[in-house]
Every structure is written in structure tokens, then in C-alpha cells.
Amino acid sequence: MPEFVRVAINESLWEFPDIYEFVRFLGGGSFGQVAKVRLRGTENYFAMKRLMRPFEREEDAKGTYREIRLLKHMNHRNVISLLNVFHPPAHNMMEFQQVYLVTHLMDADLHRYSRSKRMSDQEIRIILYQILRGLKYIHSAGVVHRDLKPCNIAVNGNSEVRILDFGLSRMCADKMTDHVGTMWYLAPEIIFLRGQYTKAIDVWSVGCILAELITDRVLFRGENYVSQIRCLINIMGTPTREFITGISMERSRNYLEGYPLRQRCDFHHLFMGYDVQAIDLMEKMLEMVPEKRITAAEAMLHPYLRDLIEPHHHAEDTAPVYDQNFENMVLPVKCWKELVSHEIRNFRPDQLDLHF
């Protein structure tokens, strides 16, 4: 049993096993704080995340359980995986107040990476293909990410990609009513509350990311909810009757039905000078009607990416179905703590292929 050490990091007291050495603070936010650590006696570096207030409220405790369960389930080279999870020694559930996650250390997120250099078309293709591989794997588990954006995609110097941040993820059939994620990458069915959200919302986000990678600018850059709608319609045109009839809120339907008619922009004109196959794939990802939108698996077979496919990818990109029945459970914090504690106790680092 390793000893725990206490280290003051960014005005917070961290407690972690002495097998790790603190290197430097990487950043943080409402989700938690992240530090770079080294496995003692080696040159192996990892990212250690200290969750912020993991058990403050019932929804926080449930979110902590969700994040651990999802990360434990994922085992793919293009998706962040859980390498270790622990909490400082606690004699009882009242003392159990902190949770730490250890994951792969990546050099930068895609937002910073894409702005630090001029990316070639080949590099864009390689990065996009890896995003789609990871997304296909996530979707095969029956999970929708819901918050794909450049800062939730990590990249190493060798263009290796991993999808991050499953804090908002849900099963496909979940009927969500909140607007999650950054507005600029939200699918129109989220903005207009159109029925049940499916895997298609993530594909829309990847289409927005592709547009940003090839042009170096955000495609739908709204300043607020109303301007986001205008940005969307200015490029995509007035939603069709097929799209509008699927909207559950009468107010949203009436708003769109009364909106001045506008034709969809010609993508080949809008993106003139860029790779025509990239534009064609982007159009298929940015289809307003989600039922007609290309899937991650189909996008990987598109001519823009087809030559990157390897025979073994199909098996590697398929995950076991993820059991998320707990999402329907309403429990007090104490019970969620016990479930989290059980997940931590039963985690075995060697259950993952750590040599990706």
C-alpha cells in the first residue's frame, strides 16, 4: 500500500500516492484542477486531475460516478482512458471528500495546437480521421459525447489525438432539455430542442471542427443564443419543413416558420480554394436534419479519408455496450459516495492496454 504525500498546488492541498512526483500545475476550472506528474524513478509522465467538490451535491456525486464509469469503460488509442483512480485515506464516508484521476498526458488541446502552427491538409486529414475513430468507438458503446469542441480534443506533437471530457456524456436515448457544450459547436437540434438527441449531434460538432481546421476560423460564431441562430441560418439557410416539424416547442416552431426565407450557402463557393473532398465531407456532417446526417463510421469511409483506413481498425473501433442504467437513479450523496468508493476499490490499472 503506497504512502500518501501532501503537496500544496495552486493554493490547494493535494494528497496522492508517493509513487507520483509533482512536476507542474497545468490548469483548471469548475471541473477540477490538473497537474503534470511523473511516476517516481521513471521518465513516464501523466496528467493527474483533482476533481472539484466531487460530492457537494447529489448531481455532483452522480457526475463523479459517471465520469469514473465512462473513463473506465473506454479503452481506445483516440479516447482518453483511466490509468489510475484513488482517494486519500479516509476512515469513513464523511472523510471521503476527494477524488483523483490519472490519465495520459497530452501536449495541447486542438484549439491551441491548430493556432500554434499552419497545419497541412495531410495533417488535418490525419487528425480528423483519429477524431472519427475515437467517436465511432464512443458511439459503438451507445454513448453520446455531447460536448465535442477543439478544447476537448487533445493532441501530441506527433499528431496523436485523444477525445477528452466525458462529464456531459449520456446514453443515446436520453431526452435532454438543456443546452450543453459551447454554442458554436452545438447541433441545430440542440439549439431548437428538436426531439431526442442522438449520436448525430457529435458528428455535427466534428463538421464544425473540420471547417475551423481548414479555414482557421469558427464557422458559426454567435455571441449569444439569438445571434447563434442567425449565424446558423445565414449559412445553412432557413430550416426545412422536415426539420421544423420535429421541434417540440411551439414557440421555436413559430419563430422558424416566421423567419425570412434564406437559401443555404453553396459550400463550394463559401470554401472556395479548399480541398473539394473536405468540403463534401463537411457538407454531409453539417446536414440540418439529423436523420440524414452522415455517421462517424460512414465519414471514415469518405474519399477524403479512405486511404487512412487499416483493416484492423474496424475491430479496434468497436466498444462493448456501456451500461448506464444508473442515470435513472435518484440517490442521496452518501449512496453515490459508496458507489464511487466501490469503483475505486475495484479498479485495476492492468485492465487497460497502457502501451498505446
From Swiss-Prot:
Phosphothreonine (modified residue): where?
T177
**Membrane spanning residue stretches:** none
PTM text: The phosphorylation on Thr-177 activates the enzyme. A conserved Tyr, which must also be phosphorylated to activate the enzyme in closely related sequences, is replaced by His-179 in this sequence.
Q: Any idea where the Protein kinase domain is?
A: 20-305
Organism superkingdom: Eukaryota
Question: What cofactors does the UniProt entry give for this protein?
Answer: Mg(2+)
Listed A to Z, the keywords are:
ATP-binding, Kinase, Nucleotide-binding, Phosphoprotein, Serine/threonine-protein kinase, Transferase
GO cellular component, alphabetical, reads: cytoplasm; nucleus
- SS bond list: none
GO biological process per UniProt: intracellular signal transduction; p38MAPK cascade; regulation of adult chitin-containing cuticle pigmentation; regulation of lipid storage; regulation of response to oxidative stress; response to bacterium
Q: Which GO terms describe its molecular function?
A: ATP binding; MAP kinase activity; protein serine kinase activity; protein serine/threonine kinase activity
Q: What does this protein do?
A: Kinase involved in a signal transduction pathway.
Q: Which family does it belong to?
A: Belongs to the protein kinase superfamily. CMGC Ser/Thr protein kinase family. MAP kinase subfamily.
Q: What is this protein called?
A: Putative mitogen-activated protein kinase 14C
Origin organism is Drosophila melanogaster
